From Swiss-Prot:
This is PspA protein. GO terms for cellular component: cytoplasm; peptidoglycan-based cell wall; plasma membrane. Induction: Expression is regulated by ClgR. Induced by carbonyl cyanide m-chlorophenyl hydrazone (CCCP). Induced by the cell envelope stressor SDS. Overexpression of PspA results in altered lipid droplet morphology. Residues 240-258 have a biased composition (Low complexity).
Length: 270
């Protein structure tokens, strides 16, 4: 039976991880993914370099071993030649020594040739491993480039998504006519203006229907009548300024006092 504390711990860790992923910045997550891909490529490149280095080292050992084999072959031939010359000269002791030297060189030659065969096998395996490592690095480099290109695309899409979210929020706010915070909405401002306008109209109607309103109307009517009378007087005086038909200038007459006490203007010549 599983430990309940372990299960609870795993559940909390999974929940915590999901919450982090849910609230994490996508831009940061994209950068983390690219950095992880770069670290993987770097590690793969180092491993491939070690494999290729091992193949190069085996190649150098093989070349040295082949050079040693060539030298041993030359030594064996030289020892056999000297042994033949000593035998021809009748020097059996020298011939024996040269033959023994030739046998020793031949034994070394056999050992070197066996070592070369082993090195060739290892070298072939190293060549195959190096080729595979190179291909793996090339493939991973292509994958890394694709991820970098994908990062650029995702960042562009992320910026577009942010702008679209802002536009959508603005449109939603305008459609609901709900201004954020303490700023009044358009409906509230419209209601306030209409309420003030209606109150002003109501006050004007009350003023017109009151006694003071009637008195004000009488005063306004008197002012208008006086203004009309004054206008007619000015017109009459302007008509009197014109010359008579005989060409003589009319003698002006003093203004006479009207019944109301005001002095009325008299046109010239009347």
């Amino acid at each position: 039976m599983a430990n309940p504390f372990v299960k609870a711990w795993k559940y909390l860790m999974a929940l915590f991880s999901s919450k982090i992923d849910e609230h994490a910045d996508p831009k940061v997550q994209i950068q983390q993914a690219i950095e992880e891909a770069q670290r993987t490529h770097q590690a793969l490149t180092q491993q491939a370099a070690q494999v290729i280095g091992n193949q190069r080292q085996l190649e150098m050992r093989l070349n040295r071993q082949l050079a040693d084999i060539e030298k041993l072959q030359v030594n064996v031939r030289q020892a056999l030649t000297l042994a033949d010359q000593a035998t021809a000269a009748g020097d059996a002791a020298k011939a024996t020594e040269y033959n023994n030297a030739a046998e020793a060189f031949a034994a070394q030659l056999v050992t070197a040739e066996q070592s070369v065969e082993d090195l060739k096998t290892l070298h072939d395996q190293a060549l195959s491993a190096a080729a595979q490592a190179k291909k793996a690095v090339e493939r991973n480099a292509m994958v890394l480039q694709q991820k970098i290109a994908e990062r650029t695309k995702l960042l562009s899409q992320l910026e577009q998504a942010k702008m679209q979210e802002q536009v959508s929020a603005s449109l939603r706010s305008m459609s609901e006519l709900a201004a954020p915070g303490n700023t009044p909405s358009l409906d509230e401002v419209r209601d306030k203006i209409e309420r003030r306008y209606a109150n002003a109209i109501g006050s004007a109607e009350l003023a017109e229907s009151s006694v003071q309103g009637r008195m004000l109307e009488v005063e306004q009517a008197g002012i208008q009548m006086a203004g009309h009378s004054r206008l007619e007087q000015i017109r009459a005086s302007m008509r009197g300024e014109a010359l008579p038909a005989g060409g003589t200038t009319a003698t002006p007459r003093p203004a006479t006092e009207t019944s109301g006490g005001a002095i009325a203007e008299q046109p010239y010549g009347q």
